[in-house]
UniProtKB/Swiss-Prot annotation:
Impact after mutating D60N: Impaired ability to sense protons
InterPro entries: GPCR_Rhodpsn (IPR000276), GPCR_Rhodpsn_7TM (IPR017452), Psych_rcpt (IPR005464)
Record keywords, A-Z: Apoptosis, Cell membrane, Disulfide bond, Endosome, G-protein coupled receptor, Glycoprotein, Membrane, Receptor, Transducer, Transmembrane, Transmembrane helix
Name of this protein: G-protein coupled receptor 65
Lineage of source species: Eukaryota, Metazoa, Chordata, Craniata, Vertebrata
Residues with site note (Required for activation): E142
Tissue: Predominantly expressed in thymus, spleen, lymph nodes, small intestine, lung, placenta and peripheral blood leukocytes.
Gene: GPR65
Topological region Cytoplasmic: 43-46, 119-126, 213-216, 294-337
Provenance organism: Homo sapiens
GO term, biological process aspect, one: apoptotic process
Length: 337
């Protein structure tokens, strides 16, 4: 299938994506490496939450490592200069990150809901073994759902009159192909709408339980409520604009006439590309939310960073502290037992 050239979009991508992606790389790669260390140690302490956090950080890190390729692509005004196989792999990891992230965020929300609302029930759902099984299932299912990108031809050549040259596009072409429309509609429903509703319901129930629990101090209540709001806002801001524009794109381009593209369709595509760039910020938000928002998370992360940079004190006591994890729940919601 051919692609229609949108000259203005190439110019926008040339400046927008490198700026956003460079920021994400600088912040998210060290943050997610630290988060992997912290969550791994938590998982060793029989924490099911550590399993979900580890998977979330791994997904973010894998995507962040592909961003240099996308920076080169957009800096060259949407011209893919690498092999088609790298295009397929980069697109695969990008969408794997989008929808594995929403899945793991949902798992964390459900886990916190069970811990707070039903602290004396459903113990088997809050074991490390169960969390490991769920995480592996998510990785396998997301691999299957996104595998279509590994065998479909993801590169297409378009000619732009303004540039008087050909451009090799990677995956995101205009208009969408039929298989892309069907896949995106499926993703929007199962990978965004269902997780969003689940997170909203779980967080609302947790908020109600915390608010009416007299055994919890006001300071602790405020911290928990702040965390719940942060989780919801981060999910909505990172993923809602993208999926709204993706849904509009699918509707407008479902029966588009290639020879007669409307201005509204092109404007929608421009807005969609902006939301793609903003979605990458979830790689920054995730480690901040789930490792820095609590006192124990910040302390363990800081010790690991000092250890990695060689500035850690050589005393045996501090070394032992680096390799230990507080038994206090990272999310600090277990106070309601």
């Amino acid at each position: 299938m051919n692609s229609t050239c949108i000259e203005e979009q190439h110019d926008l991508d040339h400046y927008l994506f490198p700026i956003v992606y460079i920021f994400v790389i600088i912040v998210s790669i060290p943050a997610n490496i630290g988060s992997l260390c912290v969550s791994f140690l938590q998982a060793k302490k029989e924490s099911e939450l550590g399993i979900y956090l580890f998977s979330l950080s791994l997904s973010d890190l894998l995507y962040a490592l592909t961003l240099p390729l996308w920076i080169d692509y957009t800096w060259n005004k949407d011209n893919w200069t690498f092999s088609p196989a790298l295009c397929k792999g980069s697109a695969f990891l990008m969408y794997m990150n989008f929808y594995s992230s929403t899945a793991f965020l949902t798992c964390i929300a459900v886990d916190r809901y069970l811990a707070v609302v039903y602290p004396l029930k459903f113990f088997f759902l809050r074991t490390r073994r169960f969390a490991l099984m769920v995480s592996l299932s998510i990785w396998i299912l997301e691999t299957i759902f996104n595998a279509v990108m590994l065998w479909e031809d993801e590169t297409v050549v378009e000619y732009c009159d303004a540039e008087k040259s050909n451009f090799t596009l990677c995956y995101d072409k205009y208009p969408l192909e039929k298989w892309q429309i069907n896949l995106n509609l499926f993703r929007t429903c199962t990978g965004y709408a269902i997780p969003l509703v689940t997170i909203l319901i779980c967080n609302r129930k947790v908020y109600q339980a915390v608010r009416h629990n007299k055994a919890t101090e006001n300071k602790e209540k405020k911290r928990i409520i702040k965390l719940l709001v942060s989780i919801t806002v981060t999910f909505v801001l990172c993923f809602t604009p993208f999926h709204v524009m993706l849904l509009i794109r699918c509707i407008l381009e479902h029966a588009v006439n290639f020879e007669d593209h409307s201005n509204s369709g092109k404007r929608t595509y421009t807005m969609y590309r902006i939301t793609v760039a903003l979605t990458s910020l979830n790689c920054v938000a995730d480690p901040i939310l789930y490792c820095f928002v609590t006192e124990t998370g910040r302390y363990d992360m800081w010790n690991i960073l000092k250890f990695c940079t060689g500035r850690c004190n050589t005393s045996q006591r501090q070394r032992k502290r680096i390799l230990s994890v507080s038994t206090k729940d990272t999310m600090e919601l277990e106070v309601l037992e």
